[in-house]
């Protein structure tokens, strides 16, 4: 390989920095955070779906742990395992909440676990 030839992964990295890719990534990420929970509440919380949807949206507050990082936002950083409320230990706690008899705590559990899933999907993109 000559010194100036692009590496094999240069097309992939060029694609990942393209405006189209970044736009699609942002659309997927935020629709998963704000639209998909509506489907969860319609399935699991039919009687209290509006309250459950509000609770699930409030689970976005776990992103406040990003304020502890420097820089606060880094598009190339994976949140999972980096921020305190995005760790395996936090996920275990969120999972334990799902065993509560309270539907509100179950909504918090599903919201937080879906939030972590969404952030993990973002890491894979």
PLM features: residue spans?
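N-terminal membrane-targeting hydrophobic helices
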Residues: 1-125
């Amino acid at each position: 390989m000559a010194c100036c030839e692009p590496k094999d992964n240069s097309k992939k990295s060029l694609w990942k920095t393209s405006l189209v890719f970044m736009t699609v990534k942002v659309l997927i990420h935020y629709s998963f955070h704000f639209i998909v929970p509506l489907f969860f509440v319609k399935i699991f919380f039919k009687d209290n779906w509006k309250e459950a949807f509000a609770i699930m949206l409030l689970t976005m507050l776990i992103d406040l742990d990003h304020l502890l990082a420097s820089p606060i936002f880094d598009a190339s950083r994976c949140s999972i395992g980096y921020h305190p409320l995005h760790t395996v230990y936090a996920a275990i706690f969120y999972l334990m909440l799902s065993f509560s008899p309270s539907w509100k705590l179950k909504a918090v559990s599903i919201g937080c676990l879906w939030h972590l899933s969404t952030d993990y999907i973002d890491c894979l993109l």
